Structures are given as structure tokens and as C-alpha cells.
Amino acid sequence: MIRKVIFFVAGVFLSASLIVMAQSITTNNEQNTYKQLARFGDIFERVRTQYVTIPDDQKLIENAINGMLLSLDPHSSYMDAEKAKDMRDSTKGEFGGLGIEVTMENNLIKVVSPIDDTPAAKAGVLAGDFISKIDGKQISGQTLNEAVDQMRGPAGTPITLTINRFGVDKPLDIKIVRDIIKVKAVKYRVEGDIGYLRLIQFTEKTFSDLQAAIKDIQSKIPTDKLKGYVLDLRLNPGGLLDQAISVTDAFLNKGEIVSTRGRKQNDVMRFDAKLGDLTDEKPIIVLINGGSASASEIVAGALQDHRRATIIGTQSFGKGSVQTIIPLGENGALRLTTALYYTPSGTSIQGIGITPDIVVEQPLPEKYKGYDVTLGESELRGHIKGKQESDKGSGSAAFVPRDPKDDVQLNEAYKLLRGEITHAAFPPDPNKVF
């Protein structure tokens, strides 16, 4: 009994010692941080007082902030008040510009996806293109926000993008006229006995537009004739998390849709489906490719894990991180990566992507042969390395032909839904566990 007490007391002293040590380490770390900040202040003062020309203090500070955020990952950034407003406008589905989703890679702007029916898409800008110049001026050394700011502008104004395209010997100058970009969140059509749903982007209107599209399809195809739906998420760069959750919920009656996990062990949020499948549990085939990112992967991953849909296409982009927009009042906003998201099976797709149940490659037209249209998170410099990421990486070709007749992936989906061909992965086995 005495020995037990002694051990207990020893444990208390040991714990107390560890607490003192931890406090000491914390204090030392804080002191070191303040020293580094003092060093920054010293350098800042020397630059503003000794540089050959008088610099703009605000630009110096903003660029320092951007440098700090860019050192974290490709998706964290600072936005001044004007850029924060532009970001809010884009999530509403309407803004002035070219209509391309871009990221930064090797000091160049890389096109993730041109949005359908926008000036950039009509002018021939392709996923995977690198923008090296804007109106003849090199953009190397600029931040992503600075380059995007130059590409946006009033409708009717011209802009010339100099494009470096893999497989093309010389840079291409593509002239584009800016327009008001009204992103139609959902496009749909009736294909005989099949409902085709294409989600362009996850904006504030995506779920409501999807509801309306499904309702209209159901009014045009009798229930006993409707074979199912094709949900096309190819070239969809993502968008709002809440819209991805609502869209997924439209096809489920129960179960987890997605979970997000932050830096702390208890920093976990789970989102579950509610009763009510809008498609009356009709068969669903989801199409993905290297241009399917973020919110698109949440939808595809959840429907795949719950065996609600069969996924066709090629490996998706692999962006499994969540960005939180932190308002800074009149000083703009901070776009900061705060969590990773996980599919219902507990899988993080960061740097991996969603693997289709049925891999179907889309052949490139002759003029693009030898051109690399592969997109993937794992290729981005400074990306957060996923726990399950391998040398294989993420992503695949990001190309969809304009003519549905040439769309091999889409036609594969139609044939499966109509029973013209069979595959073990369709329909998915609902009894198969994660």
C-alpha cells in the first residue's frame, strides 16, 4: 500500500516536471518567434528607408503575407478587400473575366479547367495550359491573386494570354474578349430514356439548379421508362463544401457524406444524409477525370463508398483539403487550409484522388496527340502530402470532347444503363461494406 502511494506521488512529481518543461519549451518557442518577428521588422524598415526608390508600404506587407501563406500550400492565400469581393461574386456564379479555374505551379499560372461556354473555353484555352504572359508582360514572380486580378476586368475589354502548351514547340498567343461570366451551375438534357446531369461548378445555385433539373427530367421521362442518370463531374474544379454535401444528399437516404478533420484530435465535423432520394433510387453513373477536384471528389467519393453509384472515367485531381474564408474586415480576407476531408470509408483523397470503379480513357483528338493534359494535386509544388499518397500520385487527363458522339466515357455510361453491355461494377453491390 505504501509502495503504491510512493509510486503515485512519484508520478505526480514526474507530471509536474513535464509540465514545467513544456511551459519552458513554450516560453522559449514564443521568445524565438518574437525574435524572428523583430528580424522581419528590421528588414522591413531597412527596405522602406534604404531601397533605391520609395516602396509602397502596403504592397510590401501584403507581399510578405502572401509569401508566408504560399509557403504553406498552393490553396492558402491572402485577399485584399477587392479580391475578397471578387471571390464572393464567383461563388454566386457571376463575375467579369475569362472563365478559367487556375492554380500556381513553378511560378507560372496553370489552367485547371476552362468553364463551359465562357470566353476562355471558346477561344481554345485547355486544361493543363501554362500562362506565361498577360498582354505581353511576363507574370513570373507574381502571386496567383495578382495574375487573376489582371485577367479579370470589364466585359468587352480584350486580353492576350501567352500559353505554353506541352507538345507545341512555340508559345501560343490567344486573344480573348472579357465577358460577364454567368456560371450555369448545372446543365442537363434528356437522352431518350436517360437523364444527363452535368455539374459545372459548386456555386450557391448548384443544389437548387440540380433539384429543378431532376424534376424537369422526371416530367419528361415516365418513371417506368427512366433507366437512370449520368452525373457528369468531369472538369468540375469544385467550389462550396455545403453545396457538395447537399448535392450528395440528393442521391442518398442515409449515411455519412463526408467528414472534415483539423489539426486537433477533437476537431472533427461529420455531415450525414437525410431521408429523401430525389431520383427515387434510380441507377446512377458518375463520370470523373483529372479535372474533377475538391467538391466533385466529395460527391463521387460518398456515392462510391455507399455503393449508390458506379464511377466511370479516370483518376480524379486529388484535392482533399478544406479552405476556410476568414474575414478581416476592411482588410479583406484570409483563405486558409484548416482541415482535410475524408470519404465515408475514412479515406483521405489528398494527393490520391478517387479511383473509378470502371477505368475508361478518353482518347485525345489528333491535334492534341503528344500534349500532356494530365492534372493532379500531387503535381502541385508545396501541396500537403496525403497520408496515403504514393509515387503514383493523383490526377489524370482532363479532356472532354465537345461532340457527345466522340465522348467514349459518356457513351460507356449510356450502354451500361441501357443494358447494352455489362460490367461487374454495375450496378454496385449495396451489401458490400467499406
Swiss-Prot record:
GO terms for molecular function: serine-type endopeptidase activity. Residues 383-392 have a biased composition (Basic and acidic residues). Residues 383-406 are annotated as: Disordered. GO terms for cellular component: extracellular region; outer membrane-bounded periplasmic space. It is found in: Secreted. GO terms for biological process: proteolysis; signal transduction. Keywords: Hydrolase, Protease, Secreted, Serine protease, Signal. Residues 1-23 form the signal peptide. CDD domains: cpPDZ_CPP-like, Peptidase_S41_CPP. Belongs to the peptidase S41A family. This is Carboxy-terminal-processing protease. It comes from Bartonella bacilliformis (strain ATCC 35685 / KC583 / Herrer 020/F12,63). The lineage of its organism: Bacteria, Pseudomonadati, Pseudomonadota, Alphaproteobacteria, Hyphomicrobiales.
